[in-house]
Regions:
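Catalytic machinery of carbohydrate-active enzymes
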Residues: 1-297
Length: 297
């Protein structure tokens, strides 16, 4: 259960048989203390043996309501590690398996795509790529938080280098929070990229999987790139990559720790200098791309 636009990446793709929207009206009753749970919701929940929740619920109101509604077992963790806790977010999520005694050996996320996802991606690229022999590079210049974004002028310089110096096809991924950055890129790099605009996550993942390289910020799309196995370069600044960094065998993270980094959400919200990300240069990224090309990684 969650937001359907996110959960599509697992529905019928190995991890989930069915999904349920979190933004249904009756769900809101779970967050009200001593709530009278609607019969429609109680009917759904009574047949559930176990719920593992990563919803913020510090007062345990939701947990209490779930148990009152008939759920046999509820395991709850806050959605993120406590601030200052030295644990990667993936290891935080895996705590529930430790509690249940479920063994696991691999801590690297992997996305499984449907054949139809791959076919859509192939058709998308065939319609837009004039030379399939050229290097395909996906770039995501956005993030859910502007302070986590590498400066847009550096993306401009990188995109122009990719298209003009190594003759690569550049695909720019645009999501709901990226409109401002995309409009600026359209002005500054003109027709030097192919826009991947507002597509469902399984399709975005399939397109990235077809590419030779991904470059992006600390964002969910970067984790997606790592999970499909595409070589990924990511720029971190205000957040700690040892906690939030994408995991993968082909991931390179650039992080230039500054005196104020990593910082709290409140500090980040009021920061307009982003000196932590200023320390990552275009030449850093170009050097890594040259290395990847040289060794065909």
């Amino acid at each position: 259960m969650g937001y359907s636009s996110f959960l599509e990446i697992v529905k019928g793709r190995f991890y989930a048989d069915t999904i349920s929207r979190f933004d249904q009206a009756d769900i809101s009753h779970l967050f009200v203390d001593n709530s009278r749970i609607p019969a429609s919701l109680t009917k759904k929940l009574k047949g559930v043996d176990l719920i593992i929740s990563f919803v913020s619920d510090k007062g345990q109101i939701m947990v209490s309501n779930l148990r009152a509604a008939g759920v046999k077992h509820v395991i709850h963790y806050e959605p993120f590690p406590s601030e200052g806790e030295a644990i990667h977010v993936i290891d935080h999520f895996l705590r529930c398996l430790d509690l249940l005694g479920v063994p696991y050996s691999n801590k690297i996320p992997k996305i499984f795509l449907k054949d139809e996802d791959i076919v859509f991606a192939e058709n998308f690229l065939n319609d837009r790529v004039d030379d399939p022999k050229k290097m395909l590079v996906t770039v995501h210049p956005g993030s859910g938080n502007r302070q986590k974004c590498w400066p847009i002028d550096r993306y401009v310089e990188l995109i122009l280098w990719l298209s003009e110096k190594i003759n690569a096809h550049v695909l720019i991924i645009s999501g709901p929070a990226d409109r401002e950055n995309i409009e600026e890129l359209k002005v500054k790099v003109k027709n030097s990229f192919i826009l991947v605009d507002q597509l469902p996550l399984p399709i975005v993942a399939a397109i990235i999987k077809q590419c030779n390289l991904f470059v992006g910020n600390d964002s969910g799309i970067t984790h997606l790139a790592a999970a499909v196995g595409t070589p990924a370069i990511s720029m971190f600044g205000p957040t700690d990559p040892s906690v939030w960094g994408p995991r993968g065998e082909r991931v390179k993270i650039f992080y230039r720790k500054s005196p104020c980094s990593p910082c709290s959400f409140d500090m980040r919200k009021n920061c307009f200098s982003n000196i932590c990300l200023e320390g990552v240069t275009v030449e850093d990224i170009i050097s890594e791309i040259r290395y990847i090309k040289q060794y065909n990684l």
